Amino acid sequence: VLADNVRKWGVGNVAVPVNDPSQVARLEGWFDAVAVDAPCSGEGMFRKLEEARTEWSEAGVALCAERQRGILREAWRALRPGGLLLYSTCTFNFTENEGVLRDFLVWAAGETEPAERIAVDPAWGVVCGAEGDFQTFRFYPHRVEGEGFFAAAVRKRAAGGERRRVPRPQRDPLAWADRRAVQELERWVEEPEAMRFAAVGGTFYGYWQPQAEAVAMLSGVLNVIASGVEMGQLFKGVLRPAHALALFTGPPRGGRVRVAAGGGAA
């Protein structure tokens, strides 16, 4: 679902891995920002889904909180010094929100600092607060549009602030296109000189140069199921374009790679 949504967005500077959070932590100190959309007890779905109400239990809340604590710790390891951590759930109870943050702050003592404060207009109906260095936001369904959720932000204390370099895999996980294929693929994109192309299972994908190295590194460490912009397949040297290419909105601004991870990992 996440990979399909990325294609609908029309962006190409994205990699979608499917991994356990402990595997994401292999990229220690690499990410500028990590968003943890944690699996939760789903109290924000009570109004919308009957099964959310019938499946809820105190034991389920405790289980979710334990899982959330583990995910946060692995995400923190993957975040570089000076990086930003965002935490969110679609539930309202203290245990899975401020309670998890409180336990995390004990575990990460001395490593956190407040993120830049976000000014929130009272007319928006958002309930703002704080838990230690975390700035917190509660979105209640009777105050805002939607079913409601919880969010919080904190920054990792800068200790040099440098991103850790992750060793490149000995073998390049991406099969880069040959010259003949490149000539055909370049006809379909703007700024072709800024792109590289790779084939995966007979389908070609395009990567902006600043993204290509990052995706190659990620593919050597994580289980990346989608990345770049799907170009299509070549038949007798002519591209049969993929639907994703029609949705492609063009080059990213700033030369950064977005990483979308399912399961609340990162």
Annotate each PLM feature.
Residues A33, Q135-V166:
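Core SAM-dependent methyltransferase catalytic element
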Residues V1-G29:
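S-adenosyl-L-methionine
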Residues F31, A59, R67, E98-W124:
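Conserved Class I S-adenosyl-L-methionine
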Residues E116-V144:
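Class I S-adenosyl-L-methionine
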Residues L79-P81:
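Helix-to-beta-strand junctions that scaffold the AdoMet/dcAdoMet cofactor pocket
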Residues L84-T89:
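Conserved beta-strand signature within the Rossmann-like core of class I S-adenosyl-L-methionine
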Residues E147, R157-A266:
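Polybasic, low-complexity RNA-engagement segments
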Residues N19, A33-R73, C90-E98:
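Mobile active-site "lid"/loop adjacent to the S-adenosyl-L-methionine
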